A protein has these predicted regions:
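ER/Golgi luminal nucleotide-sugar-dependent glycosyltransferases, focusing on the catalytic module
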Residues: 1-305
Length: 305
């Protein structure tokens, strides 16, 4: 099983190195470092590691902005173009950490070669009132400024002038020449090569879809979700189609254990017992200065498996 890990990261090179080391010998890593960040410390920690590919082409990434999609697509494109012909493409962030052993990770993917690890629900039929605003309002979340003061000012102005007063009427989005229902789910997914090629082909060629996705809220949680659940691959997903109701443990991330409903959502050593038996492949998020003890315990657990 040839695995390519597709990552976005922006800080803490040592933590990213620890994540990569924990998955050593399971696959290769294609990493987009936020253009706002100095890439030199990342190059230093990964010097001599042939399995790690730090992208030369980078963009400035803003939370929930279209730029997050672009960052992932640049990394995915590099992996697809590699002559190794990868069979599985796993999307991660620099704050993730594996819970399964490397042997378990490989076996899971080998035993489920045709499964698209993605989950989502239909925004049109969603019972959550704010879901529809992700599509109906125009969001401009890619911030051109470095200064936090200017970032806050830009965000406030764009919301007051563009987002709040504007509301469209069409919930469906243009995809492959027709209007389809949009879907929402976690960005962290894992695709077969067929799925990854479908995603890349859409990104490179469907201009109307891309134009619409540039103004939705958190495109990275709508872009491939809408694509997959309006394609023939929807029956190959972990739920064999969309989720039909909002569950108590929000997540829609088939491989990641994540307290999505908690603002801080940082795991610490106190969470070890909860994580060790959760059954997920990965967890997020880990933060330097808070999660080292937990990662030490997870490392020990993974060695014993």
């Amino acid at each position: 099983m040839k695995i390519a890990y597709i990552l976005l990261a922006h800080n803490n090179p040592s933590q990213l190195k620890r994540l990569v080391d924990s998955l050593k010998n399971t696959g290769d890593f294609y990493i987009h470092i936020d253009k706002k960040s100095d890439i030199r410390p990342f190059k230093q920690v990964f010097e001599g590691m042939e399995s790690v590919h730090l992208l030369e082409k980078r963009v400035k990434v803003s939370w929930a902005g279209w730029s997050m999609v672009v960052g992932y697509m640049l990394a995915l494109q590099a992996a697809l173009e590699n002559e190794k012909n990868y069979e599985r493409f796993v999307m991660l962030t620099g704050q993730d950490y594996p819970l399964m052993s490397n042997e378990e990770i490989i076996k899971t993917f080998e035993d489920n070669r045709d499964v698209e690890y993605i989950m989502a629900y239909n925004i049109v039929t969603s019972s959550v009132p704010t879901d529809k605003n992700k599509i109906l309002k125009r969001w401009y979340l890619d911030n051109p400024f470095r200064s936090r003061f200017l970032q806050r000012a830009y965000k406030g102005i764009m919301y007051r002038v563009v987002t709040r007063p504007f509301s469209g009427k069409e919930l469906r989005v243009p995809l492959n020449g027709k209007l389809v229902d949009p879907y929402f789910g976690q960005m962290l997914s894992a695709f077969t090569r067929k799925g990854a090629e479908l995603l890349m082909d859409t990104y490179l060629h469907d201009k109307k879809y891309n134009k619409k996705m540039k103004t939705v809220f958190a495109a990275v949680e709508i872009y491939w979700q809408t694509l997959f659940f309006n394609s023939e691959l929807r029956q190959n997903t972990v739920q064999h189609g969309e989720e039909h109701e909002i569950t108590e443990h929000f997540g829609w991330a088939p491989l990641h254990y994540h307290h999505y409903y908690v603002d801080t959502s940082v795991f610490t050593e106190e969470d070890f017992d909860e994580l060790k038996d959760c059954g997920y492949m990965f967890c997020r998020k880990m933060v330097v200065g808070k999660s080292e003890g937990l990662m030490d315990k997870i490392d020990e657990m993974r060695r014993e498996k």
